[in-house]
């Protein structure tokens, strides 16, 4: 595995890390401030730059709970040649793949040559660094969905990922703010999905012919009379799966102008891919990446401290 300026994963050599052992119950931000004698702003910068792992898991959460015996690693690398783009932030990179956090408003890959996309951003970034590679799309997020994505840097790795996706990617989760008060703490939604002639995906309890079976698991985190915060785990990865399935149970995602009910309190689709866990396609190493829940989602609820239950 390559060690370059953007790596923040568990394969860093010890010389490129400050390795710290947790001695008492605390939070990650407070631990960094005290253990490394950092200012609060400097500690936040390091976390935001994806330079910290807890027990080999990348995290950016200020309030990540820490327990005695856990190991925190802080990268000594000062990131250079950093990608500066409002839509794409590199979370992890090695010679085989790159993990990004995509913001809403940009395509994962272009449908036509002139469309701006995360793939184009990465290809331009590689070219500026004189890397002889391109970003190969192995899965997608909708334009208006934000969150974690992975791109292969070679045809070889892309093929491994595409042929073994469900064996390699073992935990992919989303957070969504949806309309209405959820009736259940959790459940599973199953149906057949198929596009109609207008390219709108519709759901059916039986295969309409040419449909694709889809399974979505959900867990309610917070609920009010107006909105609910829901964690979603995909067992299948179909086009528009989450959006259609939440519509199916009467709780469409807020800000969804295609499958929603018109409720758009923050001016965007309230769907974010916050967790991506997989086995490295070349080394087999367990790779774990998570982002905080979007703050604008949390502001819809009284308790704005809800975070991923890691």
What are these regions (language model features)?
Residues 2-310:
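RNA pseudouridine synthases
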């Amino acid at each position: 595995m390559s060690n370059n300026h953007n790596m923040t994963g568990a394969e860093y050599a010890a010389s490129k890390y400050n390795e710290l052992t947790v001695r008492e119950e605390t939070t990650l931000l407070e631990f960094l401030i005290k253990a490394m004698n950092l200012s609060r702003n400097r500690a936040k910068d390091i976390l935001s730059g994806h330079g910290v792992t807890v027990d080999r898991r990348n995290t950016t959460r200020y309030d990540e709970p820490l327990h005695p015996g856990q190991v925190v690693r802080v990268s000594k690398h000062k990131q250079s040649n950093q990608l500066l783009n409002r839509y794409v932030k590199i979370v992890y990179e090695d010679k085989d793949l790159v993990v990004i956090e995509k913001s809403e408003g940009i395509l994962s890959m272009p449908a036509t040559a002139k469309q701006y996309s995360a793939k184009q951003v990465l290809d331009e970034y590689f070219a500026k660094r004189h890397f002889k590679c391109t970003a190969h799309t192995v899965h997608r997020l909708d334009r208006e969905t934000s969150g974690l994505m992975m791109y292969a840097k070679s045809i070889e790795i892309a093929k491994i990922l595409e042929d073994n996706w469900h064996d390699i990617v073992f935990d992919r989760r989303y957070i969504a703010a949806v309309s209405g008060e959820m009736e259940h703490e959790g459940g599973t939604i199953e149906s057949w999905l198929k596009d109609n002639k207008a390219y709108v995906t519709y759901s059916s309890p039986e295969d309409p012919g040419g449909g694709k079976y889809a399974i979505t698991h959900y867990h309610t985190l917070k609920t009010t009379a107006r909105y609910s915060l829901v964690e979603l785990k995909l067992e299948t990865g179909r086009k528009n799966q989450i959006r259609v399935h939440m519509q199916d149970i009467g709780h469409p995602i807020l800000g969804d102008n295609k499958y929603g009910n018109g409720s758009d309190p923050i001016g965007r689709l309230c769907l974010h891919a916050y967790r991506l866990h997989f086995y490295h396609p070349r080394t087999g190493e367990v790779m774990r990446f998570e982002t905080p829940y979007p703050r604008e989602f949390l502001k819809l609820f009284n308790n704005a401290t809800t975070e991923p239950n890691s």
